[in-house]
């Protein structure tokens, strides 16, 4: 309803994401661009499976109009090393996602601001494990999958997400 996500379901905050990114991701879910071994991906894939193009477009437009909100966080977020997370983010993420985390549509890089750390950690792991970015039509996903291999340690990934969640929006 609010688009700010649901931690219990593992659903991400959709507010603040660009219309083009939302459209690409929903189309990708429908086209099978993501490995659906996890409950969240299966849920999303089945939720949009029967939507026609007009319904998908209407959903994208409605999501894009939602006011930007910060996602709720868990206590685990505070456990990351923010200084190390900032250094890693600057070195490996900022060229595409921007120094302030707001993304770059021209590069296909979404805004990370407002996403919760659990979601970011899970999605990053999916790229590292080849569960995202494997489909030949997912140009930007393949790019992220290649780049994700630079940082594979779960503790370092957590440090990056801990840094990102504290960025202002």
Tell where the protein language model's regions lie, with residue ranges.
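Short, electropositive, low-hydrophobicity segments enriched in small/polar residues
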Residues: 7-9, 20, 89, 102-107, ...
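Active-site substrate-binding loop specific to GH73 endo-beta-N-acetylglucosaminidase modules
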Residues: 26
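Axial heme c-ligation environment in periplasmic c-type cytochrome domains
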Residues: 7-13, 29-59, 63, 73-75, ...
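Sequence context surrounding c-type heme c attachment/ligation sites in exported
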Residues: 15, 19, 23, 86-90, ...
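Sequence/structural segment immediately N-terminal to covalent heme-attachment motifs in c-type
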Residues: 1-4, 77-102
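Small disulfide-bonded, cysteine-rich extracellular recognition modules and tandem repeats
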Residues: 17, 47, 96-99, 115, ...
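Activation segment of ePK-like protein kinases, specifically the conserved APE
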Residues: 3, 34, 68, 101, ...
């Amino acid at each position: 309803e609010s688009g700010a996500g649901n931690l219990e379901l593992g659903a991400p905050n959709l507010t603040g994401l660009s219309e083009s990114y939302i459209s690409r991701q929903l189309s990708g879910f429908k086209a099978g661009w993501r490995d659906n071994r996890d409950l969240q991906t299966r849920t999303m894939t089945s939720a949009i499976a029967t939507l026609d193009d007009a319904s998908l477009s209407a959903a994208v437009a409605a999501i894009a109009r939602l006011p930007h909100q910060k996602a709720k966080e868990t206590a685990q977020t505070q456990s990351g090393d923010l200084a190390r997370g900032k250094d890693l983010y600057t070195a490996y993420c900022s060229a595409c996602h921007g120094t302030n985390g707001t993304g770059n549509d021209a590069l296909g890089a979404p805004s990370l601001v407002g996403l919760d750390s659990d979601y970011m950690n899970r999605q990053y792991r999916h790229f590292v494990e080849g569960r995202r970015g494997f489909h030949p039509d997912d140009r930007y996903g393949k790019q992220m999958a290649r780049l994700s291999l630079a940082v594979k340690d779960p503790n370092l990934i957590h440090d990056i997400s801990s840094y990102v969640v504290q960025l202002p929006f």
